[in-house]
Amino acid sequence: LALGINAGVGNLGVSIIYLTAPLLLGWNLSSFFGPGLQSANGGLLYLQNVCFFWAIPTVLTLVLIWLFMDNLPLPKQSPKSVLSIFGNKHTWLMCWIYTCGFGSFIGFSAALGLLVSKEFPEVSFSLAAFLGPFIGAGLRPIGGWLADKIDSGSRVTLIALFIMLGASILVLMGIQSHSFPLFFGAFLLLFLMTGFINGASFRMIPYIFGNPFHSSLVTGFTAAIAAYGAFLIPKIFGWAYSSFQSVAPAFYILIAFTVSTIIITWWFYDRKNSGIHC
């Protein structure tokens, strides 16, 4: 639960950007931060406003870290001990699972605007773009709490993956039928499930690895790998549009990835004879 709250609040940054950036881009503060840039429709965009806005919480965070954050004493570990996590198959399996959760969250956050502009150009979406990331980040602590409640992060992850699979199919159906309510509703369900997966899968890692030092290393490493979703998912969508003039092939790839994650989660962590209770 604590990990979920910490990461969930951090993930809210994506939602806050989507909510505030459209407002800040059109706010004329040229007397303070310089002139705007000409946009395609003849208006002015003040890109620098977003950077200056985020300077305020950044400075505040630095002050709070300086005043209140502690460096906890830890026993020294040899390089061999650190590198040992890369020889453990569970490190890579958890990277796969967490990428399906957090990688999808951050990737869909980055790509949703592109999808709407391509498939539903008649929809004014800028001020609603924050909803998906907001739901995904807000539900992350609940995923960790549920995993603690039923004593099984793998079970929460597995159920969420099945629902995520169904939501992905519904998103594709919404695109093919040109139904924005179906598309957007299914996408919000996708974001909701990524929150559950993120919180529950993070709970799995300490139970799989046992050693607190190794658990912390794997937690950081899986998060770093999963963050590539912000790059890969928009690239997959872009490739599908440029190669096939359709987003469907991209969703076929993502659906196959979700199915593979379901199999991995069940086989290694949730089936009766898996040998690991997490």
Positions of PLM-derived features:
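Glycine-rich segments within core transmembrane alpha-helices of 12-TM secondary carriers
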Residues: 1-25, 29, 223-233
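Extracytoplasmic gate region of multi-pass secondary transporters
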Residues: 89-141, 202
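A late C-terminal transmembrane helix in Major Facilitator Superfamily
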Residues: 209-246
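C-terminal membrane-cytosol helix-exit motif in multi-pass small-molecule transporters
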Residues: 26, 54-75, 264-268
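Helix-to-loop junctions at the C-terminal end of transmembrane segments
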Residues: 140-152
